[in-house]
A protein has these predicted regions:
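Short hydrophobic/aromatic beta-strand immediately N-terminal to the Walker A/P-loop
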Residues: 335-338, 457, 557
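Conserved helicase motor core of P-loop NTPases
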Residues: 462-628
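Walker B catalytic acidic pair
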Residues: 434, 460
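Accessory, non-ATPase domains that flank or precede helicase/AAA+ motor cores in DNA-metabolism machines
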Residues: 1-298, 302
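C-terminal accessory regions
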Residues: 625, 632-754
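Short, conserved "post-DEAD/DEAH" coupling segment immediately C-terminal to helicase motif II
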Residues: 440-454, 472-477
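ASCE P-loop NTPase motor cores of helicases and related translocases
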Residues: 247, 268-429, 478, 484-493, ...
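Loop/turn-to-beta-strand initiation segments
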Residues: 362, 426-429, 453-457, 714
C-alpha cells in the first residue's frame, strides 16, 4: 500500500454520474496521478490518499485509491486556490483573493464560526456570507458522513446515495434499523444491510432483521419467475437465509401485511404470499383484459367476401383456422393466436393487417425484444417496435421509498412509460408478437395504455419457455378459457419441406426424431466427449456454417442448456473467445469480475437497464437518433475500450451505440455461447447446440424445442443422440408460481354475479 499527501493540482477527468475521477496531485514537488471515486473534490483541496500503485499500459504509474481523506488547505496560497476553483458557488478567483487577503490562514474558521464577518469583504453581502457558510458546512458534513459510512464497508457510490437520501438522519437509520436502507436505496439489498447490522451489533433475531429477510426471500422468488410463493416454501427459504426457525415468522408476515408490502391469499386450501405490487399487477391486468374482451356481432358472409378479395389480391392461401382467426379478430376486442413454427402465424397476421387497413384503421405492431421486433418488421413490411419503445419509456432516476416492490437492487428508479391510461396509444388495432416472452409487469404496462375499444391481438407459441421476468402470462390467459383463442396446427407445404419445422413439431409432440436422416437444415453429429463436442462446434461456427447459410460468423449462435460445466456458457465462452478473438497488441481489453472483455468480442446484456443511453450515428460519427434502455438478452459487439476514461462502447442491433462505464460491466457477459433461456425471441441463420448429459430439470422438452425453433436456416446438434431423445421424452417443466389465471377467473366470477 502507498500513501500520497498533497494538493489537487488538476482534475484531469471526471464522470459526474458516479464520481470516478483522475487527479493530478502535487506531493513534495512530485506529481502523482490518482484514480478512483471521489464524490466531492475540487482543485486546490489537500488530500491524503491510500491505495495500490499500478502501472497503466498507456498512462504509466497511477495510485488506485482505496481510501482517502480531505484535509483543509494549510497555507494561504492553497486556500486562495481552493476557493477560486469553483468549489464554493459564488466565489471566483478575484473574490477568493480578497477574502484570503482579509482573513489569511483564519479564512475557514471565519466561514464556519463567524460567517457574518465575510460581509466585511468588498463584494460579499450578508446573505451571500450566509450562503457561503452553508456550503462550507454542507461539504464538511458530507465528508464526515463518507468517513462514517466507509467504516461499515459501504462503497463511495452507495455512501453518496445514502447521504443524499437521508442527510444527517442517516446516522440514526444506520444505528437503529439499517434494514431500512434495503427499502430506500437502490444498490443496497438485504445482504448489504445485514452486514451493516452485524457490525452495528443488531441481534440475529431482531424483528427488523426477520421482517426484512422474509420480504427479501419473497422478492428473490420473483427473480426465478414467480409472482408468489406458498407460505410454507417462503418460510423455508427465509429460514435458510436468516438461520431462524420458521415458527418465528408468522408474526412478521402479519406485520408486512399491515405495512401493505405483501398480500396473503388462499389457493387449494393453502396460503400463498405475494409481494403486493405483483398481486395488484395480476389483479389489474385481469380487470383490464376483461374490459378489452368485447364481442360485437358481424356479418360473417360480408367479412368472408372482403377476406376473399384480400387473399386473391395478395395471393394468400388460408386454412380454416387462419380464416377463423381473421373472423375472431374482426368480431372481438381481444384475441390470442397461438401455434408452433410453420403453422402460418405470420401469414395470419399479414392478412389481419390487410383487412383492417381496408377499414382505414390505425395499426401498431410490437414485440418484447429488438430482434423480435425486427423479425416482425421484415415479415410484415410494417414498422414494429419493441414494447418499451411503443410505450415511450422515459424519465430520470428517482428514489421512491414507498415502492413496495423494491428489491433494493433492480428497480425502474423513476423511469416511466409516457403512454399510459392518461396518454393511451393512438391506435384502432395493436398486434403483439412473441407473447410467451411478455412478463406480468410488461403486459400490465401495455394494457394501461390500451383504450377500451382498441382491438388487441396477442400472438405467440405457448410451448416456448416462459418469460424471464415474473409470471406466465400467455399460458395463464389461454388456460383461463376466458378469451377467444385460435390454435393454429397445420404445417403448411413450404414449411413441411423444412426439417427444422417438422422436427420441432415432433419434439413438441414427444415423438422420435430421426437423427440419421440426410437433411439440408437439421444435422446431428455424434460426439461422446465434451472436448470433441467443443472442437466440432468451433469448426462449424468458423469454417462450415458461414458459407452454408450465407451469414457472418457473429450471427451464428451456440446455445447450451446450462451455465456451469465443460459445456456450460462460462467455460465455452472462454474457449470460444480464445479461438475467435485472441489477444493482440492492437486490441484493447478490460478484465472485470473474472471475465476479459476485448474489442471485437460478442457480448450480451444480462439485466434490464432502463436508464442507459444509446445513439445511432451516421458514417461521419454524427448522432442521428438516440434513446434510453438496453434490455436483458440484447447482444452486440465491443467496438472500443477507453482505459483512461474507463468506458467501453458496444454496438447493438440497429447500429445502437452504448457507452458503459467499467463499473457497469457486470451487466454484460460474453455471448459466443448463450443459454437457451437467453435466446427467447431471437432468430439466427444457424444455431449450434451441444447435447450431453446434464441435470434432468434442465434437459427438458420445451428447452430443446425452444433452441431448435430459434434457427432460420440450419440446426446443428453435436453430442449424444440418446441424450437428445431423453430431452424430447422429458416433459418436466420447472414449477412457476403465477396467479394470473386465478385473478382472471375471479374477475369473471364477480362480473357474472353483478
Amino acid at each position: 500500500m502507498a500513501t500520497v499527501t498533497g494538493y489537487v493540482e488538476r482534475i484531469k477527468y471526471r464522470n459526474e454520474d458516479n464520481g470516478y475521477s483522475v487527479l493530478s496531485v502535487a506531493d513534495g514537488g512530485e506529481e502523482y496521478i490518482l484514480v478512483g471515486t471521489f464524490p466531492y473534490i475540487s482543485e486546490g483541496e489537500r488530500i491524503e490518499a491510500t491505495g495500490r500503485m499500478v502501472e497503466h499500459s498507456i498512462y504509466g504509474e497511477q495510485l488506485a485509491v482505496e481510501s482517502y481523506e480531505i484535509k483543509a488547505p494549510e497555507d494561504t496560497l492553497a486556500i486562495e486556490r481552493y476557493l477560486g476553483s469553483g468549489a464554493i458557488k459564488g466565489i471566483g478567483a478575484a473574490l477568493a483573493k480578497r477574502i484570503v487577503k482579509k482573513f489569511k490562514a483564519d479564512t475557514f474558521r471565519i466561514m464556519e464560526e463567524e460567517p457574518e464577518r465575510l460581509a466585511e469583504v468588498k463584494g460579499v453581502s450578508e446573505r451571500m456570507a450566509m450562503e457561503i457558510s452553508s456550503q462550507v458546512e454542507e461539504k464538511r458534513d458530507m465528508r464526515q458522513a463518507m468517513v462514517f459510512l466507509q467504516q461499515y464497508g459501504i462503497s463511495m457510490n452507495l455512501a453518496v446515495k445514502i447521504y443524499q437520501h437521508y442527510g444527517p438522519g442517516m446516522y440514526s437509520v444506520i444505528q437503529e434499523n439499517p434494514y431500512q436502507l434495503a427499502d430506500d436505496i437502490q444498490g443496497v439489498g438485504f445482504k448489504i444491510a445485514d452486514e451493516i447490522a452485524a457490525k452495528v451489533g443488531i441481534f440475529t433475531d431482531s424483528d427488523y432483521r426477520i421482517r426484512s429477510g422474509l420480504f427479501y426471500a419473497l422478492l428473490q422468488a420473483t427473480g426465478n419467475g414467480h409472482t408468489y410463493l406458498p407460505e410454507e416454501e417462503l418460510f423455508a427459504n427465509a429460514s435458510a437465509l436468516l438461520n431462524v426457525e420458521p415458527e418465528h415468522m408468522e408474526k412478521h408476515l402479519v406485520d408486512l401485511q399491515m405495512e401493505k408490502k405483501l398480500v396473503v391469499k388462499e389457493k387449494d386450501g393453502k396460503r400463498i404470499v405475494y409481494p403486493a405490487q405483483f398481486y395488484y399487477m395480476e389483479l389489474n391486468t385481469a380487470r383490464m383484459l376483461h374490459d378489452l374482451n368485447l364481442h360485437s356481432k358481424i356479418d360473417e358472409d360480408d367479412v368472408k367476401k372482403r377476406l376473399k378479395k384480400i387473399t386473391e389480391a395478395e395471393k394468400i392461401e388460408l386454412d380454416e383456422l387462419q380464416e377463423q382467426a381473421v373472423l375472431e379478430a374482426v368480431s372481438n376486442g381481444l384475441l390470442i393466436i397461438t401455434g408452433g413454427p410453420g403453422t402460418g402465424k405470420t401469414t395470419t397476421i399479414n392478412t389481419i393487417i390487410h383487412y383492417f387497413e381496408q377499414e382505414d384503421m390505425d395499426i401498431l405492431l410490437a414485440a418484447p425484444t429488438g430482434r423480435a421486433a425486427k423479425r416482425m418488421t421484415e415479415a410484415t413490411g410494417y414498422e414494429a417496435k419493441t414494447i418499451h419503445r411503443l410505450l415511450e419509456l422515459t424519465g430520470a432516476p428517482t428514489v421512491d421509498p414507498k415502492n413496495n416492490g423494491n428489491t433494493g437492487e433492480n428497480r425502474l428508479e423513476g423511469m416511466h412509460f409516457e403512454r399510459n391510461e392518461e396518454n393511451p396509444l393512438d391506435a384502432d388495432v395493436i398486434i403483439i408478437d412473441e407473447m410467451s416472452m411478455v412478463d406480468i409487469s410488461l403486459i400490465h404496462s401495455l394494457l394501461k395504455a390500451v383504450n377500451v375499444g382498441t382491438r388487441l391481438i396477442l400472438v405467440g407459441d405457448v410451448n416456448q419457455l416462459p418469460s424471464v421476468g415474473p409470471g406466465n402470462v400467455l399460458r395463464d390467459m389461454i388456460a383461463s378459457e376466458a378469451f377467444p383463442v385460435v390454435k393454429l396446427t397445420k404445417i403448411f407445404r413450404q414449411a413441411a419441406q423444412s426439417d427444422i419445422i417438422v422436427n420441432a413439431h415432433k419434439i413438441n409432440d414427444g415423438e422420435t426424431v430421426p437423427l440419421n436422416k440426410k437433411s439440408r437444415d437439421f444435422l446431428f453429429i455424434r460426439r461422446d466427449y465434451p472436448a470433441d463436442i467443443v472442437k466440432d462446434m468451433m469448426v462449424l461456427v468458423q469454417d462450415k456454417l458461414p458459407n452454408y447459410v450465407h451469414a457472418e460468423m457473429s450471427d451464428i449462435q451456440i446455445m447450451t442448456p446450462m451455465r456451469k460445466g465443460a459445456l456450460g456458457v462460462e467455460a465455452l465462452n472462454k474457449q470460444l473467445q480464445e479461438k475467435f478473438n485472441p489477444p493482440a497488441p492492437n486490441k484493447q481489453e478490460k478484465e472485470s469480475g473474472g471475465t476479459i472483455f476485448r474489442v471485437g468480442d460478442k457480448v450480451m446484456q444480462i439485466k434490464n437497464n432502463y436508464q442507459i443511453e444509446w445513439e445511432v450515428r451516421n458514417r461521419y460519427g454524427i448522432p442521428v437518433d438516440k434513446g434510453e434502455g438496453v434490455f436483458n438478452g440484447d447482444t452486440g459487439i465491443i467496438r472500443s475500450i477507453n482505459s483512461f476514461a474507463e468506458t467501453m462502447e458496444v454496438e447493438f442491433d440497429e447500429r445502437r451505440m452504448v457507452e458503459y462505464s467499467f463499473k457497469q460491466l457486470e451487466e454484460l457477459e460474453l455471448a459466443y455461447a448463450i443459454t437457451i433461456h437467453k435466446s427467447q425471441g431471437s432468430e439466427y441463420p444457424a444455431v449450434v447446440i451441444p447435447v450431453h448429459s446434464g441435470p434432468r430439470m434442465l434437459m427438458t422438452r420445451n428447452l430443446i424445442y425452444t433452441a431448435v425453433t430459434r434457427a432460420k436456416s440450419c440446426v446443428c446438434l453435436v453430442g449424444i443422440p440418446e441424450v437428445f431423445q431423453a430431452m424430447v421424452d422429458n416433459e418436466v417443466e420447472q414449477k412457476r408460481y403465477s396467479g394470473l389465471k386465478d385473478r382472471i377467473l375471479e374477475i369473471d366470477t364477480s362480473m357474472m354475479q353483478k
